Regions:
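Conserved metal-phosphate-binding beta-hairpin within the catalytic cores
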Residues: 258-293
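Short glycine-enriched loops at secondary-structure junctions
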Residues: 43-48, 94-96, 121, 217-221, ...
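Active-site nucleotide/adenylate-binding loops and adjacent lid/helix of ATP-dependent enzymes
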Residues: 121-205, 217-220, 247-250
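ATP-binding N-terminal substructure of ATP-dependent carboxylate-amine bond-forming enzymes
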Residues: 1-116
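Phosphate-binding site of ATP-dependent enzymes
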Residues: 179-258, 271-279
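Glycine-rich phosphate/pyrophosphate-binding beta-alpha loops
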Residues: 230-238, 284-298
Length: 349
């Protein structure tokens, strides 16, 4: 049976030391058994490595930063669609999802571009500042947390919080602080990059495990692959990991999909204590950067997401391979200045 030709736009091309999910999502789509894909990259900066990976990305366009707002993004997507006739868009950054969710209906009705995203209500409910209430609603243990917006609130964290504690940005970054002085340092660092509020979270001793999963928007779970980090960078990112047999983690993801009716991909970051108690510490509302491990384990989540976006009925994956490793590596590309100039000055390559 011939593969279906389809044009898919993908963001998150920053394959750096803190990589975006875009390149592994594209690799998964390139290996699709049902789609013959033309990949359109959506980039924010001229030095995102994926722009120059021409074996993976057929054409790249710069798009406005999320802070520019949904209207500017829509105008740029109209221009891109006029050239590329996009079928599906897969956004891969937390910070851009707000705009893409707002535009989902317009993209579909005006241009016929499909997405597979949660609702705005679902997206906001799992924000870090709302996570504790979210856990209570869905019957999942969450570490105690509090959002702060002023330096003066740091001194009053005790006795409610014991040190060490975790200081988190509203989109990215998390630091373990052992003193109030360290909290202040991380507060300044995070607000300069991501703005307010800053989240203070109880530190849970244990082993971090993660699961990438895909929901159908009707309460069902299409697939889930749990992973344990084997090597972690100084930014806390997994440089290698292994798929594990963890039924409790999969059950947690299934329960969340059942009660929230989440549509699309997500990642759950969980701490498993020595007493085998599971605490959900974060919900990332998109595929993780290690999503290609799921493909290697027999579950192609990006392909399934595209099928759902196109309105197809997708059967749930029944199994995955345990004991498969992903090992990330750095790679030097040689790029001509003319290519860099094109993306920098013309906004496309």
């Amino acid at each position: 049976m011939p593969k279906k030709r389809i044009n898919i736009a993908v963001s998150g091309l920053n394959a750096i030391d803190s990589p975006g999910p875009g390149i592994p999502v594209i690799r998964a789509l390139r290996e699709s058994a049902v789609f013959d894909v033309r990949i359109i990259g959506l980039a924010y900066e001229a030095l995102e490595p994926g722009i120059y990976m021409h074996d993976l990305v057929d054409k790249t366009y710069q798009i406005p930063l999320p802070t520019a707002g949904a209207d500017h993004l829509l105008n740029r997507l109209r221009y891109i669609d006029g050239i590329e006739q996009l079928d599906v868009i897969i956004p891969n950054f937390d910070a851009e999802l707000f705009n893409f969710i707002r535009l989902a209906d317009v993209l579909d009705q005006e241009m016929g571009i499909k997405t597979c995203l949660p609702t705005m209500e679902q997206f906001e409910a799992r924000q870090k500042v709302n996570l504790e209430a979210y856990g209570k609603l869905h019957g999942i243990r969450i570490p105690k947390s509090k959002s702060i917006s002023r330096h003066s609130e740091i001194a009053s964290l005790a006795p409610d919080f014991q040190y060490p504690l975790v200081v988190k940005g509203k989109f990215y970054d998390a630091f373990v602080a052992y003193t109030p002085e360290q909290v202040q340092t991380y507060f300044n660092k995070i607000t300069a990059k991501w703005g307010l509020p800053v989240l203070i979270q109880e530190f849970i001793h244990g082993q971090e495990v993660n699961v990438t999963a895909l929901g159908d928007g009707k309460g069902g779970m299409i697939g889930a692959v749990p992973m344990r980090k084997q090597y972690i960078t100084d930014k806390g990112k997994a440089w290698s990991g292994i798929s594990i047999d963890d039924k409790k983690l999969i059950e947690m993801a299934g329960r969340l999909f059942e009660t929230s009716r989440w549509r699309g991909g997500l990642e759950l970051e969980v701490i498993r204590t020595d007493e085998d108690v599971y605490y959900l510490i974060e919900i990332n509302p998109r595929f993780p950067a290690w999503i290609y491990l799921a493909v290697g384990c027999g579950q192609n989540h990006p392909e399934a997401l595209v099928r759902m976006a196109l309105g197809e009925e997708v059967e749930a994956f029944e199994s995955y391979d345990v004991g498969k490793l992903f090992i990330r590596y750095s790679y030097d590309m040689i790029v001509g200045l003319d290519e860099f100039m094109n993306i920098s000055t013309q906004g496309e390559l």
